[in-house]
């Protein structure tokens, strides 16, 4: 069973997404802010990270940059999640080190397709 680290500060989004992913066979571990997400990702054991980009304190952009700049080079695939679908955000997410990008509200079939593609590429 693949394990996903969900870094999301909004409780409603966190609960909804984690339940929907668990019903599809994923184990979901939650971090509620960027700092906790970085610490947990560095500890390892995750097959994929879903990173909200609008986090309080250390946002998802900087959290992703820190993970990718880590001397131990965190290579876990990261999908950026954002409610602010601005022009250039996808490119900005990829430049920060994300492997893919998705917008909120989450359309589960679209997100699952991205998750499955990234997990398949790391096998």
Identify the function of each model-found stretch.
Residues 56, 74, 86:
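The feature encodes the CheY-like receiver
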Residues 52, 82:
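Active-site residues of response regulator receiver
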Residues 15-23:
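Charged docking surfaces used in two-component/phosphorelay signaling
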Residues 8:
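Conserved acidic carboxylate
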Residues 106-115:
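C-terminal output helix
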Residues 25-32, 40:
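Short hydrophobic/Thr-rich beta-strand motif most characteristic of the beta2 strand and flanking loop
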């Amino acid at each position: 069973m693949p394990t996903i680290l969900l870094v999301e500060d909004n409780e409603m989004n966190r609960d909804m997404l984690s339940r929907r992913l668990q019903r599809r066979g994923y184990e979901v571990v939650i971090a509620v802010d960027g700092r906790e997400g970085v610490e947990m990702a560095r500890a390892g054991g995750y097959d994929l990270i879903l990173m909200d980009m609008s986090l309080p304190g250390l946002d998802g952009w900087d959290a992703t940059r820190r993970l990718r700049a880590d001397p131990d080079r965190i290579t876990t695939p990261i999908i950026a999640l954002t409610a602010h679908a601005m022009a250039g955000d996808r490119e900005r997410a990829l430049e920060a080190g994300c492997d893919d990008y998705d917008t909120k509200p989450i359309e589960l079939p679209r997100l699952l397709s991205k998750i499955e593609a990234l997990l398949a590429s790391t096998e």
